[in-house]
């Protein structure tokens, strides 16, 4: 991650942004900033407002009110809306949208303004970008001669060609099959990072955001619930809904015993407490916090469990265990010889999360 290399001044600042479609509000008081060189993922389910937010930043949708600043320049505000073509942003959508009558070279040249790329400076820039995105050998091909992944690489190259301040990408990998999606995603993100560019991705793919983002903004019903690093959002989210959205979870009613411990059906569990004063709430645990083995890390709790079901999945084994009448599924990379009905110790690692 390149956060230590970034300058403190934000590249993009969004302040109190709202958007209505007729009477329906689709963006609610959105505020966040993006630093130079940072890659942000807007993560949420379909219809949550993330694409509308991206289009508002690009200038394709006009917000109802609020402000958008790029560097120290206002691009949207009260009685002011800078045209899209003057914002100096790159935009990549799901299926690339290349010009069918232009070859790869001229599609990229179009990103520089005239679609020709004939002068030496433009030729050098186009060749650099084609090398960076791995499409140099495709320069003379037309879009119908390209695979879906190649088309997306060309779309990214075209967006990068004018060296934009920021690139916006709306679900750029969703139209590709799974194997190709993984390959193209990795190549495109590597190209973005090598170019030193800043980017905002729209995605509904949680694993994609966790793996590749510098920061993730959780978008739900037109609001940003939380924006933070992937690790913080997974292990220390501010809200229960965010915690559940970020990964598989075990949620149980619980009561605080003291500031650092809660009692639930499993037993007494050390917790990170997100409640200021309330004693009753819920505790959230991740399945991977449970193990049948001692590790170098001291466990935070120890339970007695009984195996109810075993599912072998190759490199991992899923095991259903009953603890104090409550059944959970855990996954172990290496499992000893186990049988249904076995009684054995179950170790909990890391603290649970308590929410009132």
Predicted regions and their residues:
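The feature captures the beta-strand-to-loop junction immediately N-terminal to the Walker
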Residues: 43-45
């Amino acid at each position: 991650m390149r956060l230590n290399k970034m300058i403190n001044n934000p590249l993009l600042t969004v302040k109190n942004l709202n958007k209505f479609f007729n009477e329906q509000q689709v963006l609610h008081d959105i505020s966040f900033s993006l630093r130079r060189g940072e890659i942000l993922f807007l993560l949420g389910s379909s219809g949550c407002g993330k694409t509308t937010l991206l289009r508002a930043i690009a200038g394709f949708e006009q917000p109802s009110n609020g402000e958008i600043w790029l560097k120290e320049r206002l691009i949207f505000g009260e009685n002011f809306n800078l045209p899209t073509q003057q914002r100096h942003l790159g935009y990549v959508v799901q299926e690339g949208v290349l010009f069918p009558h232009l070859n790869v070279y001229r599609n990229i040249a179009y990103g520089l303004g005239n679609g020709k790329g004939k002068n030496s400076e433009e030729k050098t820039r186009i060749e650099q970008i084609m090398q960076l995105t791995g499409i140099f050998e495709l320069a003379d091909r037309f879009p119908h001669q390209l695979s879906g992944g190649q088309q997306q690489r060309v779309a990214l190259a075209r967006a990068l060609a004018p060296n934009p301040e920021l690139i916006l990408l709306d679900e750029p990998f969703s139209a590709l099959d799974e194997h190709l999606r993984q390959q193209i995603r990795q190549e495109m993100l590597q190209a973005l990072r090598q170019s030193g560019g800043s980017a905002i991705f729209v995605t509904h793919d949680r694993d994609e955001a966790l793996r590749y983002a510098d920061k993730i903004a959780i978008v739900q019903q037109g609001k940003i619930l939380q924006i933070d690093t992937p690790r913080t959002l997974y292990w220390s989210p501010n809200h229960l809904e965010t915690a559940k959205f970020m990964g598989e979870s075990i949620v149980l009613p619980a009561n605080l015993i003291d500031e650092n411990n809660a009692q639930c059906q499993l037993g007494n569990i050390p917790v990170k407490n997100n409640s200021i004063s309330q004693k009753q709430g819920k505790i959230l645990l991740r399945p991977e916090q449970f193990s049948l083995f001692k590790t170098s890390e001291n466990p935070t709790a120890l339970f007695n469990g009984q195996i109810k079901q075993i599912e072998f999945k190759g490199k991992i084994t899923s095991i259903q265990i009953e603890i104090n009448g409550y059944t959970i599924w855990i996954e172990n990379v290496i499992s000893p010889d186990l049988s249904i009905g076995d009684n054995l110790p179950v170790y909990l690692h890391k603290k649970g999360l308590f929410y009132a």
